[in-house]
């Protein structure tokens, strides 16, 4: 490993530890179970899963560091000149699915790729972001989530938050449904334009912001009573989450195409999901308001 890779790895392992600790404390019941694994083709990771807690129905916070002799198609699709290069990929990826339908699902990811070829300069980039998927929308939560995202981006330029917010809205769009997966946040990839030190600082700012963005929302909503019908709606909306992850998500596709660890890759899927044929929310209902108002391309910081 190069000194750059070592620095990124040390940060990611510490980030995984800190996020797991914060989530365990908030749950107050369940604890993460760690599964350390080794990849035959090169590398390994620490999968940490949690479930059946007071707050968290299912969740995972994964660290992986894998390497190989050739980049898979999902990683080189936008940069065909890198096809066939050896690579290292490091990242922390997490998804939290709460029991209570009033608590949104959250997802975050920070990652580092380096692609090498003998006799040529190494090419590296960072990617990541975080996004929120509510089932019952609340403006206060949406504004808070995006405010924390904006504050994390602010030291790196006034254009960074709007640029990566818009990218998130485009990326987490379920094309065959014509709707977004959630209310967005930040998404970026192929980031190397600022030089390594600044890009690495940005990744740390985004990784460190996740807990500040998510836990205040959890604390406000986790004790809200809910009905069996609301739980059913949550499971129906979770189906959209599954559809996006299995059809479009670059991280999922990269993991599967590179011979990654299937259990860790599919950790993001919720434990209980529902599909109903041509199901529609009742007009004027909270359920209808989710798609009509909250799941729209909206500037939440203009409120």
UniProtKB/Swiss-Prot annotation:
Cofactor dependency: a divalent metal cation
Stored InterPro entries: Coprogen_oxidase_aer, Coprogen_oxidase_aer_sf, Coprogen_oxidase_CS
Region span, Important for dimerization: 241-276
Record's subcellular location: Cytoplasm
Gene Ontology molecular function: coproporphyrinogen oxidase activity; metal ion binding; protein homodimerization activity
Keyword Oxidoreductase among UniProt keywords: yes
Signal peptide (residue range): none
Pfam families named in the record: Coprogen_oxidas
Pathway membership, UniProt: Porphyrin-containing compound metabolism; protoporphyrin-IX biosynthesis; protoporphyrinogen-IX from coproporphyrinogen-III (O2 route): step 1/1
Active site feature: 107 (proton donor)
GO biological process, one term: protoporphyrinogen IX biosynthetic process
Gene Ontology CC terms, in alphabetical order: cytoplasm
E.C. code: 1.3.3.3
Site (Important for dimerization) location in chain: 176
Keyword Glycoprotein assigned: no
Function text: Involved in the heme biosynthesis. Catalyzes the aerobic oxidative decarboxylation of propionate groups of rings A and B of coproporphyrinogen-III to yield the vinyl groups in protoporphyrinogen-IX.
Subunit structure: Homodimer.
Family under the similarity heading: Belongs to the aerobic coproporphyrinogen-III oxidase family.
Protein name: Oxygen-dependent coproporphyrinogen-III oxidase
């Amino acid at each position: 490993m190069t000194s750059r890779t070592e620095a990124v790895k040390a940060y990611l392992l510490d980030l995984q530890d800190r996020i797991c600790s914060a989530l365990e404390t908030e749950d107050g019941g369940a604890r993460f179970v760690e599964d350390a694994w080794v990849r035959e083709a090169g590398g390994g990771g620490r999968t940490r899963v949690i479930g059946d807690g007071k707050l968290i129905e299912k969740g995972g916070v994964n660290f992986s560091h894998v390497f190989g002799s050739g980049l898979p198609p999902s990683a080189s699709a936008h940069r065909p000149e890198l096809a066939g290069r050896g690579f290292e990929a490091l990242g922390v990826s997490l998804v939290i699915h709460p029991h209570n339908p009033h608590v949104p699902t959250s997802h975050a990811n920070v990652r580092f790729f380096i692609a090498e070829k003998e006799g040529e300069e190494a090419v590296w980039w960072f990617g990541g972001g975080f996004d929120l998927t509510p089932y019952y929308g609340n403006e206060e939560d949406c504004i808070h989530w995006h405010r924390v995202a904006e504050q994390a981006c602010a030291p790196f330029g006034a254009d960074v938050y709007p640029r990566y917010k818009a990218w998130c809205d485009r990326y987490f769009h379920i094309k065959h449904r014509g709707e977004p997966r959630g209310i967005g946040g930040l998404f970026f990839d192929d980031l190397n334009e600022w030089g390594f030190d600044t890009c690495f600082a940005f990744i740390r700012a985004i990784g460190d912001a996740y807990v500040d963005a998510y836990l205040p929302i959890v604390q406000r909503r986790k004790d809200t009573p809910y009905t069996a019908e609301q739980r059913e709606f949550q499971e129906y909306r979770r189906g959209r989450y599954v559809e996006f992850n299995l059809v479009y998500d670059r991280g999922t596709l990269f993991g599967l195409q590179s011979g990654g660890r299937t259990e860790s890759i599919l950790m993001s899927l919720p434990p209980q999901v529902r599909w109903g044929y041509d199901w529609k929310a009742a007009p004027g209902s909270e359920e209808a308001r989710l798609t009509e108002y909250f799941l729209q391309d909206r500037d939440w910081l203009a409120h």
